[in-house]
Amino acid sequence: MKNIAFLFLVLLAPIFSFGQLQSPDAYLGYTLGTKFTRHHQVVEYFRHVAASSDQVVLDPYGETYEGRLLQLAYVSSPQNIERLEELRLGHLKNTGLVEGTPNDDIAVVWLSFNVHGNESSSTEAAMKTIHSLITEHQDWLENTVVIIDPCINPDGRDRYVNWYKQNRSLPYDPNPMAREHNELWQSGRTNHYIFDLNRDWAWASQVESQQRIQKYNRWLPHVHVDFHEQGINEPYYFAPAAKPLHEIITPFQMEFQDWLAKNHARYFDKNGWFYFTKERFDLLYPSYGDTYPTYLGAIGMTYEQAGNGRAGLGIDNDEGIELTLIDRIAHHHTTALSTVETASNNKTALNTNFQKYFADSKRKYQSYILTGSAGKIAPLKRLLDLHQIRYEYLNGTQQIKGYDYQAQRNQTTRFDNGALVIPTNQVKGKMAQVLFEPDTALQDSITYDITAWSLPYAYGLKAMASNSKINTQAQSAPSAATPPLGEAMGWGTSYDSFEDGKFLAALIKANINVRYSQKPLTNSGKNWKRGNLFILKGDNLKNPDYATTARQIADKHQKALDPISTGYADQGPDMGSYALQWIKKPQIAVLAEGRVSSYNYGEIWHFFEQQLKFPFHQVRANELNSRVLDQIDVLILPAGRYTLLNAPDKKEALLQWMRKGGRLLAFGSALNAFSGQEPFGLKKKENEREIDPLLPYEDQERESMSYLTTGSIYEASVDGSHPIGMGYTKEYYSLKLSADAYEILEDGDNVAYLTKTA
């Protein structure tokens, strides 16, 4: 009898243990969709699930800029969870990153929720999805590992959720004009620095992206879904994607999207939910949550639910239908489960074609060769390291035949020993091709985003794409250490990259006086260019530790310093010449809020705080006055619509400040405030193209879009003798995001301008 009782208890134990698991509704104390859930509550629920189930393990992978936790949840059968690392390594054998016989028994599905913070239904859906998987669909988990990132952008999401809770009506007001449907200047869509994390997968400029990319490349899933929201009037979108499709995408990747779509449609049709496919959302620009995984062999997709920051708990759309948060959660939850189901049912096809993707050695070019200063090469190498793209170095000076990026034609170009070489016969070779190719083939000129991103242009490097055999070496020559100052009167160093700018900023913050040369000179056996920096003993007599501090900063920034033995130049100006100008520590202000572009402001904010690491003042646009101007040397106007020149008193205050030496920097559309205004002499260039008034209606959208410049690389000619142009090469390649252009200044300095052929 005791044995029977013991057996009864053993059989009941899993039931009692499983019974401890609560649904999101039960755990949170409200029905999902009737409230928004803050990030710390989401974290707590996922911890509850992991503590209550042997089918889930959590993997914290970092923090946001504001200190919120980023974490993954691995969901599978108990047996798979126990050997999760074994499964990961076996899966990577499909790619060649790990040697050995591949594991083709498991499908790996990665679900990424809430990259845009105010597209907030998807994190709610993530909680419902993980609960459904482990309580209703254990059969799928027998051969599938599901990786769930419940919230990629918790800073933005909490910004939205907190704002909505503070501004909603009770009960909520579904009228679109209500305050709860109109966010403030810094919306919840973006992260702390107002960056769009869905456009940061490849560039990884933000800490959230950097941490996530490391985890993603440890798994390289078969399927990746990026959950989004769109306008309140749109039906649900799921793949297949629209054209253009990058030529590297395989037929199977598109075929599997069709399989998924048919399974999604089965559920949506049953519920009477509208959807659309093959429109609007293409697969081209490589920094999205669908394209980046696609170029790494996955079935990468975007799912788009109606909603975004306008929707709140409920909103009436233009058809008079109320769109509720409950509806939005249901749709994302359905496609999430349908995705896992389809992957589980087709795990063999996924594994077979995943292996084929990485085994395919066809490439447009065999290697990319790049050369430039150490300061320009270093940030590119950091990006390649993050994405685990292998690079080598040229072994000896070589004449290489291929496509020259600067000449924009096929020719033979000399590259010196140590030039950077990225071979494409590697596991990440297809991704390397996408990021480095000089021109991207387009199936359709109408695309969702920019069509130009080639990294050699972005990093300002001389480059060639070649099919020639390249002799390479694994290591580059080590850089020389900074010599002690000894009896020398200071150091000189180059200045031709943003890395050099960071070095200069660190020196200035450490109260080390620095000069730059306005003219070329020869001193201490070395030729110095315009813009080169000089750290001299005579400028730092009141700072006895300046030499030690300067060397420490140079070592930290991997910056070579060359000793200046005498102030007397062999050629050009001496160290005491007026041509060597002292660099003053500037007081900088950047305008924010109002009609300022939040995106452009965020770029500038991130630039100063996270890249340059130099202080600046954030000033509200409507609070700019003479008192503010008197305290600053530099005023930065991000893109936006400004009226500061409309009021005569404000215009005069600005002009007086500029006459006293104030420097004004205007970005993008901020230039419109000065166009046609005296005494600035700035004139906007009018577009000379005309639209045919008799054009058929169906062709009008395509014709109007052909006038737009949403992302193209242009060659600019730079005056390197001007202080602003010092350190640049004569040709500079820039990404233009609009068609706005201005006439050459007749009274002023044209430091850089687009050539006539641009």
Segments from the language model and where they lie:
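Aromatic- and acidic-residue-enriched carbohydrate-binding clefts of CAZyme catalytic domains
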Residues: N175-F195
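Short, solvent-exposed turn/loop segments enriched in Gly/Ser/Thr/Pro and often Arg
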Residues: D149-N153, Y164, F227-E234, A670-L671
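Active-site cavity-forming subdomains of large catalytic enzyme subunits
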Residues: N162-H181, A202, Q206-S209, R218-P221, ...
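Bacterial Sec-dependent N-terminal signal peptides
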Residues: M1-S23
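Carboxylate/His-rich catalytic cores and anion/metal-binding grooves
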Residues: I130, N143-N167, P171-Y172
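Intrinsic-disorder/low-complexity accessory segments
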Residues: Q20-S120, E124-T135, D139-V145, R199, ...
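Short acidic, glycine-rich surface-loop motifs adjacent to enzyme active sites
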Residues: T190-L197, F227, L637-G640
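Proline-aspartate-enriched helix->loop->beta-strand connector
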Residues: Y216-Q230
